[in-house]
Every structure is written in C-alpha cells, then in structure tokens.
Amino acid sequence: MRDLYLVDGYNVIFWVPDVFGRDDLESSRKKLIDLLQDYGAHNNIEMIVVFDGMGTSTKVKQEVLSDSFAIVFTPSRMTADSYIEKESYIRRNEYRSIYVVTSDGPEQSQVLGNGSYRVAVDDLMWSLKHDKKDQHTFIKKNNQTNRRSEIGHSLPPSVQEKLDKLRGKK
C-alpha cells in the first residue's frame, strides 16, 4: 500500500510565483507537473494534481499520465478544494496515508477531519528541492564508481600477472 498526494495545483503555483511565475499558466502547470511526476516516481507516491476548471466543462476532466500520476480539471461549478476534500474522504481506505498539498487554511482543516495529512506548499517545495539534490548525489556517486569498468580487474591475480608480463610491465 502506498501514499497518495492530492495537490491543489493552482494553490501551489500562486503560492511560489518566484518558482513558477504567473504570466503563463500553461508553462507553470507543465513545470509543476514535471516536478511532481519526478518526485512521485522517485518516492513511490501516487499523485493527483487538481486544477480548477474555471468554466471549462460540466464534468471532471482527468488525464492519466501513468498508473501513479493523474491530472484533474474540475468542472465549472466545482473548486479544486471541494474535489480534493471529496476524494480524500472517498479514498481514505485505499492508501496507507493521504496527503493534501495546499496552503489554503480552511481546506487544510477540512481534510484533517477526513483523516488525511496536510502538507503546506512551502514544505512540498522543500521536499522537492532536497529530493532533487538526493537524486543528483546518487547519480554522481554511481557515475564515479561505474565510470570505467575494465575486465582486467575481474581476472584472477595470476592471470593479471601473466598479462602484465606480456605487456612488459613486470
């Protein structure tokens, strides 16, 4: 059983405009989705990122990008907050833990009543930043240890000596 993160997408974008900007919502959404996909995959977390549909439809639009990542646009008369509150209640027995990412105070209070955990946007951003550092450290470490894998190092010492003699090293 794994964890589920329900993320209020626009709340995250507008909470940290220095990271996402406010001029182009499409590129801000794309950047947030990329960061969350990477974080979720690296930490085995299921993610649902919810955006207010703002008058676009009368039905929920869901785009499933993988078995552990989905994007939801709410219908015109439903806010991301109400969708997240409903989903956190409906899914409460399907996951080990449900985390709701928002810095909206009333929404945080509501989801706590459903048994979910709240994650402030600042805390999520800290986790994303440190997870990225951990990934870079892991990659750098593995690249250094695997940089050159010579077959000679895996040969028995007696064979290595004979090869060295043939090359004139001993």
Regions found by a protein language model. Give the residues of each.
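Nuclease catalytic cores that cleave nucleic-acid phosphodiester bonds
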Residues: 2-5, 11-170
